[in-house]
Structures are given as C-alpha cells and as structure tokens.
C-alpha cells in the first residue's frame, strides 16, 4: 500500500492526545472518533497530521500548500460555530484542488435541508411519511392530509438533536408546545411528519461514479420504559 500524507480536519477541542492511556472512557468519549481515525491511519502506515479548525481557513491553506497532503480527511461538522457552514470548508478544499473525504458541497447542502431532501426522494417515487414545515414564528396547524400521531423534528439540525420521547405528539396542544420548543430553544424551523413506528436501520454508502453500499446495521432498543417509543434520541 502506498504511504499517504493525510491531513485530518477536526474541531480544535477534539484534537486527540497521542495515547488514551490515563483517560477514562467518559473523558475520551468526546474525541474518540478523532482518535480512532488518526491512530487507524497511522497503523496502516500513513503519515497523519491532525489540524484543529474553527474560525480560520488560512491554516488549511498553509497545510495544503506547504505539506501537500495526498488527501484531506474531513471530520468537521461545523465551521465558525455554525453547522450549516461546514459546506463552505469543503468548497474551499475544492478551490485548493485538494482531494478530500466525505460529501461534496452540493451533497451537504441537500442533506442539510430535510424538506428539500424529502422532496427529491419523493420525485424519484420513493415512499415516505407525509410532512409539513412550520417556519419560525408561524403557529402550527396540522393540514388535513396529515393525522396524529406525528413527530416534530428540527429542519436543519443533524443526527437526533432535539428529538426525545416528547417529540411524538397526538394532539394540537402538544404539537404547538413541541413546535415552540424547536423554534425557541433550538432556533430552527420545525419539520412535522407522520410518525411510523418501525426498525432503525443505517446504511453507509461510499464512492463517486461507482457506489459501494456498506453492510447494514441496526440500532436495537432495549430496556425501554413503559410507554416509550423506539426512536433514536439525543
């Protein structure tokens, strides 16, 4: 295997130490992913340089121009304290003609807006739950095309941020309360969609022109409290 120079971008507070020795599982939880990526790449024989990035693009340019990495491994999930700005870092890498891992800017933009992503999926005739968007400041009123129960999510936040057992509502009063929570506490528009109980499956896909589908894995819910619904929560 060819030895590569790999520049790993990450949040400054998540730059891992050289060793996990002396750290408890709780202490290392925040930067475990970054540590695993760096150590695995090094064990594979590559030269790895972690770089903490938060508010400045100049450090990226310096490393790309001076160190000339073969690839930039992008672990950033935000830039300038804004999740939706991560796409701009990738755009900058493209301007530098640097090869990088992960989605391109277009993919990040499309996946960030859940409503836009759902419309694209619907265009390709893939079935999905019905939904409605309540913008900040707009009072929620469920359209006739939807019926309870529904689940209330953030429109643009990723992962399960803002999702809890309280996200599933079955009447107008609870709907208004949860939408207000998303608007005021999470400062995001609210995505409200039909709640469909089922299994939680994750499918990873890598590649560009030729796509490879990785093995499916399932999130199994155990020891749920009485009345709890099996959903992934933050």
Task: Give residue ranges: language-model regions.
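ATP-binding N-terminal substructure of ATP-dependent carboxylate-amine bond-forming enzymes
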Residues: 1-101, 105-106, 111-112, 123, ...
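Glycine-rich phosphate-binding loop of ATP-grasp-fold ATP-dependent ligases
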Residues: 130, 150-178, 200
């Amino acid at each position: 295997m060819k030895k590569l120079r790999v520049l790993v971008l990450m949040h400054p507070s998540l730059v891992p130490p050289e060793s996990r020795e002396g750290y408890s599982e709780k202490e290392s939880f925040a930067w475990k992913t970054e540590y695993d990526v760096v150590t695995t790449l090094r064990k594979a024989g590559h030269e790895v340089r972690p770089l903490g990035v938060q508010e400045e693009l100049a450090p990226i340019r310096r490393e790309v121009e001076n160190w000339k990495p073969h690839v930039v491994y992008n672990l950033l999930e935000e830039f300038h304290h804004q999740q939706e700005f991560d796409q701009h870092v990738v755009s900058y890498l493209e301007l530098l003609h640097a090869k990088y891992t992960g989605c391109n800017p277009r993919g990040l933009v499309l996946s960030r807006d859940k409503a836009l992503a759902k419309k694209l999926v619907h265009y390709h005739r893939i079935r999905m739950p019905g939904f409605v968007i309540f913008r900040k400041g707009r009072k929620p009123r469920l359209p006739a095309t939807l019926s309870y129960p529904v689940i209330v999510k953030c429109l643009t936040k990723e992962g399960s941020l803002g999702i809890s057992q309280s996200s599933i509502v079955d009447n107008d009063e609870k709907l208004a309360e949860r939408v207000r929570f998303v608007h005021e506490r999470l400062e995001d528009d609210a995505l409200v969609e039909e709640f469909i109980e089922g299994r939680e499956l994750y499918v990873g896909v890598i590649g560009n022109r030729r796509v490879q589908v990785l093995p499916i894995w399932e999130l199994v819910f155990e020891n749920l409290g009485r009345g709890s619904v099996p959903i992934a929560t933050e």
